[in-house]
């Protein structure tokens, strides 16, 4: 029997700059849905990609001295690298510069032109280049006036400046579909989510009257050209929106994917582009006589305490930095737990560190560690088989486990990720309390309570298994580590379907003898400071580095310092010191002993054989009773010392100038 299909898409991202945490938010959310649906047994297709045409890309490429495709290839490589780092499980990545996409855009445009839904006219309006969007005078924010006439303003979506544009343009006659669109909304009340977005679309855009949409430009060349009138480039919102069907092979020689997966189950996007997905896209599909997607979900923005993320404000969060320092699971967990999906949320370094320490390290990590340690201590690592509830606390835990799955499922189906995770953490917290209530350390002292003790352990492991399965869509590493440490190898016990009945571990298993912390605790103060520093714009960092920390010297002063190349031939720790190493270096004409404060960063074995730079004309000194005849140069950053290593080709004794 064929699996039920599920097709989910993210917005396709505009690669005019590096992506930030907000872009990762959309894509991680899509990944969570895709993993959840796969876990439920669906045949899932998850699409993401890039929107690569338009005036801004053309200008960026020219400024960089590259062709558009050269510029784009570099940007897309970075985006794909970030998605790989986030372990996004997309099934396809569509680029609007690909032939499979351009071919569909051309055919769609010509078809709409032929059937009269697109017509040629002249457009005059206010245009934002970064947003690639036209606005009417009434939509502008902070309009500027001269002699009572508007001469400028800003985009209501982004705040970017707009410019008055007048040019020949093709128009899409969307106004004639107004009644049909409203009828579709009535028949499909859950089409636009959250409901507040639907009210916004109707009251702000549809009721005032839909104006026909300009769908081509002649002022730039980078895009899909209209086949029957090549001086026109297809406007981005026709070009970009079609990606959802071009990626499935619509109008190609092989439409099997399109026939299998269309219509989409969910289009995910940030709230600023919901208008295009809930008004223009449905009308375009109506004009093509194609089924409409089942749901459009517009999530909120990730804001900072001082408003939207902006490089000039120094508040942009790079997901790469969070992943590299704190791990992927901590990053994904924070995004899905701290920020209510559908509403705006505020990113703070304090909340990120707290979620990692309290939720992941304390609640989940300690539960796993305590449980495995007790199984090892009381049963030599062999977990007794589940026997059923032997105590009213057992019955309570089993009932809560099944209720947790039910509540979790309801939240996941409505894309309330933070609520779903909160439900899991209530269960984890209750399981930690179950340990205190059953007092295994007391039961272990009474041989007659051996069965009761074993059943407590079985309930703890089963509860942890439940939590690990429910966390699989969110965390890509921790559930695997939990299953490994519990020695749960049967894939069946890792599936969502295994949660329908409590107590499937009806045979004894050997847990790991050495539980490993899954989430190390963070130094709150240090890590909050680190995240804040990483958010500063590059210019600020450069300015800090340019501030001289010591008085300037002239060349005569510098000439007094003698620096030579040397090879470290031996090293050992200085007794009674955790900072110092006693090092022997070969300077060709002589050997010297140098005492260096690098023991916290290097072992003796790490440095033997290294070619280093040595200041050879320092006055000899004694450190911890050891004579030191020089200084090995090292670099220091954020309290970390790194030896200055020289190429091996430089001979010992060579003077460095």
Curated annotation (Swiss-Prot):
Keywords: Aminoacyl-tRNA synthetase, ATP-binding, Cytoplasm, Ligase, Nucleotide-binding, Protein biosynthesis, RNA-binding, tRNA-binding
UniProt organism field: Staphylococcus aureus (strain COL)
PANTHER family: METHIONINE--TRNA LIGASE, MITOCHONDRIAL, METHIONYL-TRNA SYNTHETASE
Gene Ontology terms: cellular component: cytoplasm
Keyword Metal-binding included in the entry's annotation: no
NCBIfam families, alphabetized: metG, metG_C_term, PRK12267.1
InterPro entries, A to Z: aa-tRNA-synth_I_CS, Anticodon_Met, M/V/L/I-tRNA-synth_anticd-bd, Met-tRNA-synth_bsu_C, Met-tRNA_synth, Met-tRNA_synth_2, Methionyl/Leucyl_tRNA_Synth, MetRS_core
Catalytic activity entry: tRNA(Met) + L-methionine + ATP = L-methionyl-tRNA(Met) + AMP + diphosphate
A GO molecular-function descriptor: ATP binding
Compartments in which it is found: Cytoplasm
Top-level taxon: Bacteria
Motif residue range(s): 'HIGH' region: 13-23
Name of the protein: Methionine--tRNA ligase
Function: Is required not only for elongation of protein synthesis but also for the initiation of all mRNA translation through initiator tRNA(fMet) aminoacylation.
